[in-house]
């Protein structure tokens, strides 16, 4: 198989970024007749797609680092989830052309420290900028969707040119729009206008609040089995609320209510969410503050989904139950089944017993991870729908413990296929 690709680049920097003519190099090499020929070529059939792409496309030193630490993981997850091979290559080609330049300089241990580069990523405790995940549905097998979140950065991040690291994410969104004519920018542009800050104001706020290290924006992708790539804009509320002198909760309400075309249609669900928030009992830590929003980057309409993320103060099962039921407002059969599943999860994974529902989980590792919820809002819905997240490693003594407990959980709920393959998949992804 002969690939027609550009010359390799220099040792440093993202030279593809400077030349827009090269931005679709992978999608040209791995689509149409070229991809059909590749799939028929026995000489590459035994090699994983990430290895094939790595061997034939140009990679500078920075590209190589990020491909090996992010692209390879994405590829391994697609292999484990059984994505069709053609879709696997098309997804990696999109990742190479559109996403790979968004990671910026190779991280250094001195990032964010005196004398080092000013920006250190915040998405994970160790400074990682990439959070991949599998969305397991129904049986944990063929419905699995590959997803990931990214905290973009570049040489401007944290400097006077971009104090709050807003520009690298914007560049990524523009590449997404250039790559896909159906990538609708209406909600992104609205979010940018409502929550992002100009350079002068960003510098002023950074000086006024030097101890605040909140991010401004993440971006996320769902790579669906249909071939659709769903982008998600994740703006944070901290800096804009400081600028306006209002609470993050009030800011979230304003932004959602003002969404083009459908903002007023979230009125009932926002009222129910507010009732849930203000009713948070003291023994659960009281009312938490929203952290961020999440917009699906789609044309605003009746199916437009918006999420508000909150982090409760407590990690006990009863705290989780309170959030999951919106303080008792959600009491239908599906919610009851979800509560039972959460109870099983806490029992199997965290070993809580009868009478320990108010006990806080034991923390084995420091860091800001913990329990997180989002409330998903849809137009005309009476109530938002909560989703539960937990940083399991924080509450487990070792990786082996995580593997054993989650395997037991999959087996308990009848996901035998996931239980049988989980330990192997974990090791293969490392």
Regions found by a protein language model. Give the residues of each.
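Intrinsically disordered, low-structural-confidence terminal and linker regions
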Residues: 1-71
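Intrinsically disordered, low-complexity regions enriched in Ser/Pro/Gly/Gln/His and often acidic
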Residues: 59-60, 96, 112, 266, ...
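Fungal eukaryote-biased detector of long internal structured cores
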Residues: 108-304, 312
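Short Lys/Arg-enriched alpha/beta "domain-start" segment
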Residues: 61-107
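Compact beta-rich and alpha/beta scaffold cores in large eukaryotic transport/transcription complexes
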Residues: 243-430
């Amino acid at each position: 198989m002969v690939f027609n690709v550009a010359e390799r680049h220099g040792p440093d920097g993202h030279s593809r970024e400077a030349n827009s003519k090269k931005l679709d190099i992978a999608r040209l090499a791995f689509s149409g007749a070229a991809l059909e020929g590749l799939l028929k070529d026995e000489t590459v059939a035994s090699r994983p797609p990430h290895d094939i792409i790595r061997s034939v496309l140009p990679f500078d030193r920075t590209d190589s680092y990020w491909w090996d630490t992010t692209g390879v993981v994405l590829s391994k997850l697609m292999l484990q989830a059984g994505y069709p091979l053609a879709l696997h290559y098309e997804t990696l080609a999109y990742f190479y052309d559109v996403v790979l330049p968004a990671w910026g300089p190779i991280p250094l241990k001195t990032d964010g420290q005196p004398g080092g580069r000013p920006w250190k990523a915040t998405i994970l405790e160790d400074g990682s900028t990439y959070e991949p995940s599998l969305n397991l549905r129904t049986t944990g097998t063929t419905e699995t969707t590959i997803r990931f979140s990214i905290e973009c950065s570049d040489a401007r991040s944290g400097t006077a040119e971009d104090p709050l690291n807003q520009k690298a994410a914007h560049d990524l969104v523009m590449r997404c729009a250039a790559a896909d004519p159906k990538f609708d920018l209406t909600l992104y542009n609205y979010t940018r206008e409502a929550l992002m800050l100009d350079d002068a104001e960003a510098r002023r706020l950074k000086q006024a609040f030097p101890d605040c290290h909140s991010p401004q924006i993440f971006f996320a992708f769902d790579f669906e089995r249909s071939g659709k790539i769903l982008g998600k804009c994740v703006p944070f509320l901290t800096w804009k609320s400081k600028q306006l002198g209002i609470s993050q909760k009030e800011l979230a309400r304003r932004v959602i209510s003002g969404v083009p075309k459908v903002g007023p249609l979230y009125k009932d669900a926002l009222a129910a969410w507010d009732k849930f928030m203000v009713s948070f009992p003291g023994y659960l830590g009281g009312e938490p503050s929203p952290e961020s929003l999440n917009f699906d980057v789609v044309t605003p309409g009746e199916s437009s989904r918006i999420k508000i993320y909150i982090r409760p103060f407590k990690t006990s099962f009863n705290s989780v139950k309170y959030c999951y039921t919106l303080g008792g407002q959600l009491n239908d059969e599906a919610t009851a089944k979800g509560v039972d599943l959460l109870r099983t999860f806490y029992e199997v994974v965290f070993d809580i017993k009868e009478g320990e529902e108010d006990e806080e989980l034991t923390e084995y590792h420091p860091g800001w991870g913990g329990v997180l919820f989002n409330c998903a809002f849809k137009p005309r819905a009476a109530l938002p729908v909560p989703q539960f997240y937990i940083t399991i490693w924080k509450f487990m003594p070792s990786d082996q413990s995580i593997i054993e407990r989650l395997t037991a959980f999959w087996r308990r709920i009848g996901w035998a296929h996931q239980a049988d393959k989980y330990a192997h998949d974990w090791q293969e992804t490392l």
